[in-house]
């Protein structure tokens, strides 16, 4: 669930702000201050994250109803909570990465393409061997290696990147052209 939910988040988050430029609403929205635009994108980011996280919840809940999968002493509810937390970090990481790449390249196709290439690299055996437990997808090995919690390092790195990026480099969330004039009253 973790890798595929993050792949889905690449598609859901790709036009989070760039949609305003494509639909020619950018000049109207540009009249607002940069902080208002960043707040708008953060709200959209949260709603998109929540939607993909709910899809992961439904998917994993259906899986647990079909397969009674007690691993060791961990019950299904604990597995569900751990999986949703881990998947939520991956969704936020790849969503943020996609938004930033689309804004840097100013092209949705190129931004999504680079994000998908990074997803393939991290989700491959090469990525697992290079980054080991620092890989954001190291959680996939959690249930196969007798509840090894070394995957938390990769999730913490992903969460720190997203939180640091959304607070310190918050202007990376929007594509801000300077040629449109603002009219303040």
Regions inferred by a protein language model and the residue ranges of each:
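A helix-boundary/kink motif common to multi-pass secondary transporters
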Residues: 22, 36, 106-107
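Membrane-water interface of transmembrane alpha-helices
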Residues: 15-25
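Broad structural signal for hydrophobic residues in well-ordered alpha-helices, predominantly aliphatic
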Residues: 28-29, 101
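Short helix-to-coil transition segments within interhelical loops
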Residues: 29-37
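N-terminal hydrophobic signal/anchor transmembrane helix of membrane proteins
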Residues: 25-27, 45-60, 157-168
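Terminal transmembrane helical anchor/hairpin motif
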Residues: 1, 109-185
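Secondary-structure boundary/capping residues
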Residues: 26, 38, 109-110
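Secretory targeting signals
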Residues: 1-16, 41-108, 146
């Amino acid at each position: 669930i973790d890798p595929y939910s993050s792949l889905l988040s690449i598609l859901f988050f790709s036009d989070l702000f760039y949609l305003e430029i494509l639909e020619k609403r950018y000049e109207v929205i540009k009249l607002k201050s940069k902080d208002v635009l960043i707040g708008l994108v953060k709200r959209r980011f949260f709603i998109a994250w929540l939607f993909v996280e709910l899809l992961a919840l439904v998917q994993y809940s259906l899986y647990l109803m079909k397969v009674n999968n007690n691993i060791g002493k961990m019950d299904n509810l604990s597995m569900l909570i751990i999986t949703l937390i881990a998947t939520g970090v991956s969704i936020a990481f790849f969503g943020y990465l996609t938004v930033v790449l689309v804004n840097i390249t100013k092209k949705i196709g190129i931004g999504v393409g680079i994000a998908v290439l990074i997803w393939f690299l991290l989700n491959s055996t090469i990525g697992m061997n290079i980054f080991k437990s620092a890989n954001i997808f190291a959680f996939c090995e959690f249930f196969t290696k007798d509840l090894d919690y070394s995957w938390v390092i990769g999730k913490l790195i992903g969460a720190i990147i997203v939180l640091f990026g959304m607070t310190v480099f918050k202007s990376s969330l929007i594509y801000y052209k300077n040629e449109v004039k603002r009219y303040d009253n």
